[in-house]
């Protein structure tokens, strides 16, 4: 389903990812582990095209996504939960979820607000609170929930 083949990514002159290759078959779960600065976040950002690999290929569900715009990668069904909390602080929890909503995708779970409130009961209790009123942990829950509202086939 996801294939990363010999990607090389840089920040300026710093060569962060060197010929990185791996495959994640459909239905598998993979974790990226490593020390600080090992390239875990850069790997995820390179897959999503938030950091453009200088070389190599990234293929998702048979589509080459190297060089694509990040929003087009997301439309293909790749969900991304950023490390840093990314919510709309002036919107309520419920409004943040609505912003992330996408049509159902074949082969993917169709997430609803109620399913996410069952998964994150703290958010259910705060559905009418603005994002800026949430704790850091609740903001991260909301970031994850909003990603799932996009009905990605891969997170």
Regions found by a protein language model. Name each.
Residues 130-134, 138:
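Conserved ABC ATPase signature
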């Amino acid at each position: 389903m996801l294939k990363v083949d010999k990607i090389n990514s840089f920040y300026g002159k710093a060569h962060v990812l060197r010929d990185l290759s791996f495959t994640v078959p459909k239905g598998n779960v993979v974790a990226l582990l490593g020390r600080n600065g090992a390239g875990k976040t850069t790997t995820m950002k390179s897959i999503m095209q938030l950091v453009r690999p200088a070389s190599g290929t990234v293929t998702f569900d048979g589509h080459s996504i190297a060089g694509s715009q990040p929003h087009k990668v997301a439309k293909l069904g790749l969900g991304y939960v950023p490390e840093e909390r990314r919510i709309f602080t002036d919107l309520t929890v419920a409004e943040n979820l609505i912003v992330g909503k996408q049509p159902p995708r074949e082969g993917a779970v169709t997430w609803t607000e109620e399913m996410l409130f069952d998964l994150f009961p703290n958010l259910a209790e705060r559905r009418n609170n603005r994002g800026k009123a949430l704790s850091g942990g609740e903001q991260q829950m909301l970031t994850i929930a909003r990603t799932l509202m996009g009905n990605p086939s891969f997170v």
